[in-house]
Design a protein with these regions (language model features):
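ATP-binding N-terminal substructure of ATP-dependent carboxylate-amine bond-forming enzymes
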Residues: 1-80, 87-96
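Active-site nucleotide/adenylate-binding loops and adjacent lid/helix of ATP-dependent enzymes
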Residues: 55-56, 66-195
């Protein structure tokens, strides 16, 4: 019987997921979306129509939004729900980064992630200073990245929240619980046998 990760709800036996689309390849998932966007642009005779998806974000939040700006917009109330973080720019000296980490109360292990990115690309666990130096050396010279306290729990929840302009309350339209599979070996059996 599958066992849920600590802090996550129990895994249902034989219950199909409500949606499996999140795990499709990006090109397959987004192709119909882009076709629909193009059709709407033609129908409404506006190439800028997609930018209205979220008018408070650059490009409507479709691409290129900076995580650091989104984090900062949460204010003092919302930021308490986030793991502590700092923004690192390419011009920051290692001593300045170390000082910023100390000022923010951060210590290894950390998570490094691009300030602009999606779907986990460029996200690395950083366990020590050497790994941070390596991450920085392999990161594009012109891009900022975020160092954030590592949340050491199994599983992850993805929440899709929608609030229409002018409304005080929004709605959660999608909730995805992700469990990361793992296998404990016995020293002799193959992976296939263990599964």
């Amino acid at each position: 019987r599958p066992v849920a990760a600590a802090g996550m709800p129990p895994i249902g036996q034989g219950e199909p997921p409500l949606s499996f689309f999140e795990f499709w390849p990006a090109w397959l998932f987004y192709t119909p979306v882009w076709i629909w966007i193009v059709l709407l642009m033609l129908w409404h005779r506006s190439i800028r129509l997609p930018l209205l998806a979220n008018p408070t974000l650059p490009a409507g939040g479709l691409v290129g939004e900076e995580k650091s700006r989104l984090f900062a917009r949460l204010g003092s109330t919302g930021s308490g729900c986030l793991p502590e973080w700092i923004l690192v720019s390419p011009s920051d000296e290692p001593a300045d980064v170390a000082r910023s980490l100390e000022d923010a109360g951060l210590a290894f292990p950390l998570v490094a992630k691009p300030d602009i990115g999606c779907r986990g690309a460029g996200v690395w666990p950083i366990r020590n200073g050497e790994e941070l130096v390596r991450y920085r050396s392999e990161f594009p010279d012109s891009c900022n990245f975020i160092l954030q306290r590592m949340v050491d729990v199994e599983g992850e929840a993805g929440v899709f929240f929608v609030r229409a302009p002018g409304e005080c309350r929004g709605t959660i339209v999608s909730l995805t619980l992700k469990y990361f599979p793992h296998v404990v070996g016995n020293g002799t059996a193959t992976l296939r046998e263990l599964i």
